[in-house]
Amino acid sequence: MIALQKSISVSALANMLNDFHSELDQKPVILNYTGKIKNLLSKGDTNVKTEKNELETFILYMAPAKSNSFGVNLCPKASKGCTVACITTSGMMTFTSNILARIRKADFYVNPETRKGFCLQLWKELVNKDRTAKKRGYKVAVRLNGTTDLDFFGILKNQIGKDLFSLTNLVFYDYTKLIGKVVKYQEQIKSGKYFLTFSRSEDNWSDCLAALNMGTNVAVVFGSDSLKPEIFEGFEVIDGDKTDIEMVKVSGKILALRAKGKAKKDRTGFVIW
């Protein structure tokens, strides 16, 4: 582990964290953070794509892969290309304050002494969103894995005995590279309780085919809008950059995404050129 001195400048810290982001192993950074997290969920209108969503959207952003203070991998199937091209390398995600906020939230979850508290706070925030949505007569979209790939439905069930699917005014959606998650939640996916999109990387096409054959959409990153085809590997292509919840409108399709941030320079095969 790498301990940071309290006197380190914010700009130096940002540079170090951005350097760590580009490494597959993502060496952990110890921030010795002991403060409280005011809100785990962020409004989707802070994201260029989610601000176009038809539904009000809330997202949980935490430090991806191993970039938390404990070195625990929160993206267990992240490939080299995925790690380098992570969405945290683009736009507002690169701001130092946002990087630190993601690490604090990840540490709150990863630390065995505070994990239950994390789950209780997340549940409380989601219950409040659900009640507000019911009172106002509309649905609210929630993405719990904005920058991670965890099974929060199982985690909250095991940690505090709460069923996220009981919050019927929330529309849960996510991206994943875990084909086991697609299999596990087939019933909820088919009933419209959970909208899950599988993510292609340079080394998981067989899992992509398995997901497509189950009727699950697969996100594929292309180098530019002009490279997005109408058909990819025999499957219809939908523009996944229109909004962040295009996945709820179709099934068994390819969601074409445009490379952003460091992904624009990817040559690992993660981005298709």
Tell me the role of every PLM-derived stretch.
Residues 1-273:
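Class I S-adenosyl-L-methionine
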